[in-house]
Amino acid sequence: MTKQPPIAKADLQKTQGNRAPAAVKNSDVISFINQPSMKEQLAAALPRHMTAERMIRIATTEIRKVPALGNCDTMSFVSAIVQCSQLGLEPGSALGHAYLLPFGNKNEKSGKKNVQLIIGYRGMIDLARRSGQIASLSARVVREGDEFSFEFGLDEKLIHRPGENEDAPVTHVYAVARLKDGGTQFEVMTRKQIELVRSLSKAGNNGPWVTHWEEMAKKTAIRRLFKYLPVSIEIQRAVSMDEKEPLTIDPADSSVLTGEYSVIDNSEE
């Protein structure tokens, strides 16, 4: 059986009995995800505030915007959509929650490319805020010419006064979280550290790392800050999978995840 994503292991549940979706023999992903059986699976995975119809419309739009997605392994695409559903994140650049990218390696079963799910900057903030214990969360880039200093220890502090040159090269990226109990946590990364993370990402040379570098750098700092934040183990595991390996769903396995969580309406900085 194909390995399930971390969250799916915890809440694995059958939604179609012994009936499995038919194997896909062509690249018509749009037709496949509009099948009633797929709508049932997505409906079981989605939180209350989202519908299967909306997620399918979003997925269809992404395929039309990035035609290469339609030529990827269908089960890999479906698996990425299901994980977006599990996390309550909408793929696409409109909200910046998550991105779907064709992944260079070939799927060993179909011979096609896999689909890579990448959590975006705003998606990372949304996941963190769901704990209900975070008052604010933000990330900033530091440029040459900015006044910037930070200290660790018993009296930790961070000072950043931006300069006037908004086009100056980035030197650091940092993320700051203020907790509702009054505590503050921050994480600072150098550009060299950010580039090292990018080099280890399977999507480091395309997609948002190329088109939205600063947002991906901010997301990377927030992701590293997660280890200090009061977020659930399930969310931490999902975040740890970000950009690391493509997900797959076996067509013969009709298992999907169901989960409950509350969504906090947040207006991003």
From Swiss-Prot:
Assembly, per entry: Homotetramer.
Lineage, highest ranks first: Bacteria, Pseudomonadati, Pseudomonadota, Gammaproteobacteria, Enterobacterales
NCBIfam families associated with the record: PRK09846.1, rect
UniProt keyword Ubl conjugation, yes or no: no
Single GO molecular function: DNA binding
Protein name: Protein RecT
InterPro entries xref list: RecT_fam, ssDNA_annealing_RecT
GO biological process, one term: DNA recombination
UniProt entry keywords in alphabetical sequence: DNA recombination, DNA-binding
Pfam families tied to this protein: RecT
GO cellular component assignments: protein-DNA complex
Task performed by this protein: Binds to single-stranded DNA and also promotes the renaturation of complementary single-stranded DNA. Function in recombination. Has a function similar to that of lambda RedB.
Keyword field contains Nuclease: no
